[in-house]
């Protein structure tokens, strides 16, 4: 086999393996950012705080940066996966990874944050591991840039725009949904079913992670430690406000209704504000909302991880996390019709049985992938994408079939014109014999 053939084969396999590695990395990185944008929001906020810039939790600028970052990474990953617009994709990814590599060099040298957050809270890498990863990815981007002609495209050039638009719509829709509500996928240690009290008491397990051992709730008025009361047996609603100065008070009526129901039924209800907090901010909230519930303070970083919302609502039973809600999705309890509906009643919210006071256990995780939140998110994207690719292959196949039939018809016509008819030859020979 000639040397150039071996070289081409080696380049083909090297470039396509690099393309798939880049695709997997960019898709995973963009997906986890889109599935939990507020997690990346807090990472970027920590970066800017190190450089002397502070952003409130309701900053649209920082949220826009997170959405753009997630969307760009996800779209680049898809373009690598399908081999679309490889030269443009390779150039964009090379510039992107160059900037990220320079940033991680700075992070590795000065350590402004404990981890870079490239994969959010889904998979935490050390700063050294992140730097090594980015260097490898930058080299792979360079390989795709200088030998991109050896990549194999999985969708026709004519229909690339449709796949790109669909991907942009999907990732932007996922970002906006999870920004408005809480993330569909929970990457933090504060997922439903977590045993807060066991972790606080030092009994660590898969359901009681060690990161919760530092939980501490302090009475805002007296300064006493009230963690024992918050994690005590029975039901406890925890209204989390990592940053009370920017907390959205649009749903204060729903919050007050839930508090009134808790008082009537003997359930605990606390407002947990992030430290440090100012008395004037708390007083402004009380004056505006008419809040009468007790206030405790806690670490703002932990409150941000509990619920990706400001405010957010948590429900604990015997120190076990049961449910959580975004401030934009709080239940309505003051409507007469809603009170008649079990799901919108307080009994339905806390998980009590409809006919008696027995506790309904949390539903077990389904063994079917498509019934899990991750499975539904993946299928919502994969199934339409496969339909688009199947229709594209049908279009390409029909085009080649038409060309094949046209060439076959033309070849038959050419053969018919080139081959003389036998009857005509005999008629030409007959007059020649008569003349002789």
Which role fits each region the language model picked out?
Residues 156-185:
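Internal/C-terminal transmembrane anchor helices
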Residues 177-229:
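N-terminal "domain-start" segment that seeds a small globular fold
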Residues 227-247:
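Short active-site neighborhood of thiol/selenol oxidoreductases, capturing the structured segment around
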Residues 287-310:
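Short, internal strand/loop/helix patches
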Residues 311-325:
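A short, hydrophobic beta-strand/beta-hairpin element that forms part of a small beta-sheet core
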Residues 378-427:
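Juxtamembrane interface at the cytosolic side of transmembrane helices
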